[in-house]
Amino acid sequence: MTLNNTTKGYFFAFLSVFATSNVYIFSKAALSQADIATFGLYWFGFGLIWNVLFATKTGKIKHIQTLNQNNFLILLILGLLEIAGTTFFFMAIRTVPNPAIVSFLGNINPVIVTLLGLFILKERYNKPEVIGILLILLGAFIISFKGGAKFSSMFITGAEYIMYSGLFYGASAIIAKKNVQKLTPTIMALSRTIFLFVFSFSAVLLLSRSWTLDWFPLWNIIIGSVLGPFLTVISGYQAIKYLEVGRVSILGSTKGIVVLIGAYVYFGKFPETYQLLGGLLSISGVILISVGKLLLKKKKV
């Protein structure tokens, strides 16, 4: 049976949501007992193995020979952006007690992508997008606000890492979308993992961190590395290859619900009622932004 491109896109988008959601769970479990540099060494080390095996098995690794100097420059830029974004992401995972909160706050990413699209790609806004942005910002404020007399103590610790991560991921997403057809999802995923592994290896070496792990974090890393550096990245790039980014974002916004369930089952943790409300507002905002982008695209056709 041959699947059309739209069906393939939805399949990869759902696969990406499942894999991404579980990354929050297994990385949180591993980081509870591992230094972030050592964690990265093993996480991306295993991820590199899975990516190389997949690229070799499918024959996609041969595509490297067709890349030109400009392609390698794009991969370098993406690699540096991913190093920054991923480092801040795992700092947030380690710092914020409940991974579901990180997932909900991560819905700020579509706002960043939309704003970057306005300034870099000269894209336009419409009413659903504006309302969506406001809902996400309101949701993020509700989730992260904890009160206090000083601005520095008003928000939960770790919220700033999610913002930094979103900025770098947003820039990476725009560049990746413009180059995914040329570079292919497999090569982009492989390149990303190589950059992150080399960075983690260097961090362990320069910071004199431990080279070994106990069995509990190692087991969670093995599972998570299949879902994260391998399955999440490849399926995510495949999804934007076949679908509009707006449709992928709508499906991706549901990951917070999956993480919420997973965090409760795995850690016995559940967000406060106001944080859950903020999370639902942010999900609604992502959906509105995505719908707005799709409406704009239909008007152009």
Regions found by a protein language model. Give the residues of each.
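Hydrophobic alpha-helical transmembrane segments of multi-pass integral membrane proteins
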Residues: 7-12, 37-57, 72-77, 132-135, ...
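Structural motif at transmembrane-helix junctions in multi-pass transporters
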Residues: 32-38, 87-106, 183-186, 235-254
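Membrane-interface helix-cap regions at the ends of transmembrane helices
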Residues: 33, 48-68, 138-153, 196-217, ...
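Hydrophobic transmembrane alpha-helices of multi-pass small-molecule transport proteins
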Residues: 116, 128-147, 253-254, 262, ...
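Glycine-/small-residue-enriched transmembrane alpha-helix faces in small-molecule transporters
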Residues: 1-42, 88, 151-178, 300-301
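Hydrophobic/small/kink-forming positions within alpha-helical transmembrane segments
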Residues: 18-21, 25, 79, 83-87, ...
